[in-house]
Amino acid sequence: VYVDDFVSLVIPTSREQLRHVSTGTMTGIHDVFPADDIDSNDPISEKKLKQLDGEYAPTKTILGFEFDGLAKTLWLEDAKRAHLLTVLHSWLRSSRTGKAGIPFKEFESIIAKLRHAFTAIPAGRGLLSPCNKMLQMKPPVVYLHRNVVLQAAVAVCCTLLRESSDAPTRCRELVSGWPDYIGVCDASSHGVGGVVVGETEACTPTVFRWEWSAEVKEAYHSGRITNSDLEMAGLLFLWLVMESVCGNLREKHVALFSDNSPTVSWVCRLATRGSLVSAHLIRALALRLKVNGTCPITPLHIAGEENSMTDIPSRLFGSEPQWLCKTNHDLLTLFNSTFPLPNQSSWTVFQLSSKISTRVTSVLLMKDFTLDE
């Protein structure tokens, strides 16, 4: 058995406690890995002890990441981040001239390092779908200026890496847990709708709906976007509604339910292999997760027959005559009678703003956006 790194985390109240834990730790290591006739080397590296790696400190470098034990944050080691930024910036500069390309081996190596770096920035994984597609194709040379989606992904990766030193990731943002809030969504060729409720945190039970624009409907019927793309856009709609309804989502746990299996898989991995449209939507969702400092979301599949609560708001636009609601008051009346809440509580209708609808529609139609949006 070979142990590469051993980490001891202590919350001491005195220096004596640190000495006690240090002695116990080193004794335990020698007991488990004693020097013998076969291997006379000491199990604890003298070289690393001289480098002070064995000293307790509030800040430590472990496996390429800097950990701050007081602030409970982590970030990529400065030298590694600087190297990645230098390479990525050189790629972007070369792409502006439209001449030089990136050797595939170099591209593959840097993307692997980026994937490791995004251990501390989980939302960064949502930017790598265009990179993953290029890795599958394995061209001898990668040209960013010929692939604007890939070029945009590299540019945003630079932004996340650059900001990570000024705003390190809180360790709590890396841990999944039981949801504080739950959102359920469904999308059809007519529109999208969903509900938001609180689980461990208080939240006004909310329902929302939105009819797709003529441009989106035309893109769907012409085959440029798929039903799964609409479902993915629906989850992005749902998230933006939750930002408004649930308040501060920093370090909160959120579960998102959908009856579309591909969408659930994409959100779980923050990546898609096939759909370029959904890759664009995942990128938008990932950036919103980063802006909000939310814990990893929990995407869950719900069977279509059990998702009747969101069938209504996603099909209120004439496809189902019995569900036709011309006003929010009609929707509220229908929802309260069909899905009554306990203690005579009432649902609330969230009116989507043009800002939110324009955001999602733009992303769905492959128009560009920024981190702040």
Give the ranges of each region predicted by the language model.
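Two-metal-ion RNase H-like nuclease active-site motif
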Residues: 176-190
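Catalytic palm subdomain of template-directed nucleic-acid polymerases
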Residues: 1-37, 68-75, 117, 262-278
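A short, polar/acidic, helix/strand-boundary loop motif
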Residues: 200-233, 262-280
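RNase H catalytic domain
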Residues: 3-5, 10, 240-308, 315
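Mobile genetic element proteins and their domesticated derivatives, centered on retroelements
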Residues: 4, 63-64, 111-112, 131, ...
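Flexible, low-complexity interdomain linkers flanking nucleic-acid-processing modules
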Residues: 65-110, 313-373
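C-terminal reverse transcriptase regions that engage the nucleic-acid substrate
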Residues: 54-172
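Acidic carboxylate-rich catalytic motifs and surrounding loops in phosphoryl-/glycosyl-chemistry enzymes
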Residues: 35-61, 65, 295-308, 312, ...
